[in-house]
Amino acid sequence: MKITKIEKKKRLYLVEIDKKESLYVTEDTIVKYMLTKEMALSKDQLEDIKNFAQFSHGKNLALYFISFKQRTEKEVRDYLFKHEINPHIIPQIIDNLKKDHWIDDYKLLESLAQQNLNSGDKGAYALKQKWLQKGCEKQVIDEVLTQFDFSEVAIKVTSKLLRKYQGKLPTKSLKDKLIQNLINKGFSFQESKNAINQLELEADEENEQALLYKEIEKQYQKFSKKYDGYELKQHLTQSLFRKGYDFDAIASALREYF
């Protein structure tokens, strides 16, 4: 068999074999095999050309994909598969890119962890879950995260949350709200507690009393339609206690209220 036509098509070349079979190859393939019109090819040579063409094209696609931002190994694999690169060739491309340090999950995760430390708001658990979803290996993730202490991030997030909720909730409920928000952002329970303790929250008794009386009014409107007397007081007490108000403060306020 021989090459009967070579024609440039944008980024690739169309190579026609015996005017019957055609394939697209990269410029690197043309150069590597010194392909020319009328060149004779054996079956094995043609197979080698096809494989290298896939490898070269796939690598070019991967480098284009990586040029926008750093990618994980799995993201590059998925991208190549999506662009119909031969699944048997993809591992070769990945190995080549890793050898040349175009793909390095460890360094990528280090960079992302540092970004989170500088300007992010996530704890280690949230980062780990996100990276696992991106296909990074658990061992690599754990090795990276052991290098970082996100306690300062937790304090920064707590300060921001405090500005949002302080003065609107009793101290106990405020602390519970802060802990829940911090846990939702991937910080451990202990990290959350430590961050709150660092800020040394102090109860504003005057404000808490005002909040308590406001809540009593609200709950009274709700329960007085169904209960009265001792039963009404019991339901009010239980409801207010669940909302984080101090039991003695509730009892004192209800004595004044009734």
Curated annotation (Swiss-Prot):
GO terms for cellular component: cytoplasm. InterPro entries: RecX_HTH_1st, RecX_HTH_3rd, Regulatory_RecX, WH-like_DNA-bd_sf. Its main location: cytoplasm. Keywords: Cytoplasm. The keyword ATP-binding does not apply. One of its GO terms (biological process) is regulation of DNA repair. It is found in: Cytoplasm. HAMAP family: RecX. Modulates RecA activity. Belongs to the RecX family. This is Regulatory protein RecX. It comes from Streptococcus thermophilus (strain ATCC BAA-250 / LMG 18311). The gene is recX.
